[in-house]
Amino acid sequence: MSRVSQARNLGKYFLLIDNMLVVLGFFVVFPLISIRFVDQMGWAAVMVGIALGLRQFIQQGLGIFGGAIADRFGAKPMIVTGMLMRAAGFATMGIAHEPWLLWFSCFLSGLGGTLFDPPRSALVVKLIRPEQRDRFFSLLMMQDSAGAVIGALLGSWLLQYDFRLVCATGAILFILCALFNAWLLPAWKLSTVRTPVREGMRRVMSDKRFVTYVLTLAGYYMLAVQVMLMLPIMVNDIAGSPAAVKWMYAIEACLSLTLLYPIARWSEKRFRLEHRLMAGLLVMSLSMLPIGMVGNLQQLFTLICAFYIGSVIAEPARETLSASLADARARGSYMGFSRLGLAIGGAIGYIGGGWLFDMGKALAQPELPWMMLGIIGFITFLALGWQFSHKRTPRRMLEPGA
């Protein structure tokens, strides 16, 4: 086995272990934020939505800067610093008793993510061969789902005692992850050339096809982020207990572990990436529409099931398509900018979703936020269809089996 092949194989295992620690650290804390501050402390959902939206916007909106800096100086220092910063954000969240302190803790957490997320994504593109990326992204998603359940279970159990224990556990996991990267991650360059920060950003901004694709995905993310805000609140409201939230993530884990990899393997040889992305988005949009009209957990979990199936179809295709469109001379910058759609869509989804949820309750129209999200999903579906039909991505990147 050549040294390059050996490095790729070792890199895969490193990426999987690193990803599991990050997912556990994140899901121990974030699914419980809305329950802690809305249900237990009585804050308005929009206050928590602002905090979650701020974290999302800071982490993803500034990702191009984190990616460009990583292109210049390498992945390791950015990843280690970012993970320590997120740990500090979680520690601060544990003592948050006013909205401004929660917002500040989410700002720190988001800034940490800005530093570590783009270089971690770029490492996947660097280490995984193009023909293997779709399946590897599917493996990461399966791991994300399992980690989400374990993290949510652990966080729900700790929440019975003290929210500070929840935040401390998340902080410790990110400190461990920082030490893991500091110890084992080689000082790899992310791009084929050591691109200056401005040059990497300029290269991305001049790629109109990529920019249009990323911005169009904002609507997709408005739906996707509700697994962290409105869906946990809805489950808690109907069940009457925050313990029921863990079953929502258990559904995701079961579907991902049983369906994600087989669907990716089967569809990669039969359907183009953009068709898989659009099909998943359509299923997600249809499942959102009736959620506000359900009256029991069985109906709600059935719709959540459909939503997750749509995500299982769409997510590997979206990740693979974003990676395929990245210029090898500025991988960090491209993967950083690819998060801008999540920044915009996530911020609007959290803040707008929280506001619509409060408004729906005030007007006695609980279906209002869900109907709006479904409509946004359909508009995004049409926008993606127009983009793919008028601005064709090179066939070698999109065709089945590519």
From Swiss-Prot:
The chain crosses the membrane at residues 13-33, 99-116, 139-159, 165-185, 214-234, 244-264, 277-297, 300-320, 340-360, 368-388. Its main location: membrane. This is Multidrug resistance protein MdtH. One of its GO terms (molecular function) is transmembrane transporter activity. The gene is mdtH. Residues 1-12, 117-138, 186-213, 265-276, 321-339, 389-402 are cytoplasmic. Residues 34-98, 160-164, 235-243, 298-299, 361-367 are periplasmic. Belongs to the major facilitator superfamily. DHA1 family. MdtH (TC 2.A.1.2.21) subfamily. It is found in: Cell inner membrane. GO terms for cellular component: plasma membrane. Keywords: Cell inner membrane, Cell membrane, Membrane, Transmembrane, Transmembrane helix, Transport. It is a multi-pass membrane protein. InterPro entries: MFS, MFS_dom, MFS_trans_sf, MFS_Transporters, Multidrug-R_MdtH. Coiled coil: none annotated. The keyword Transferase does not apply. It comes from the Bacteria.
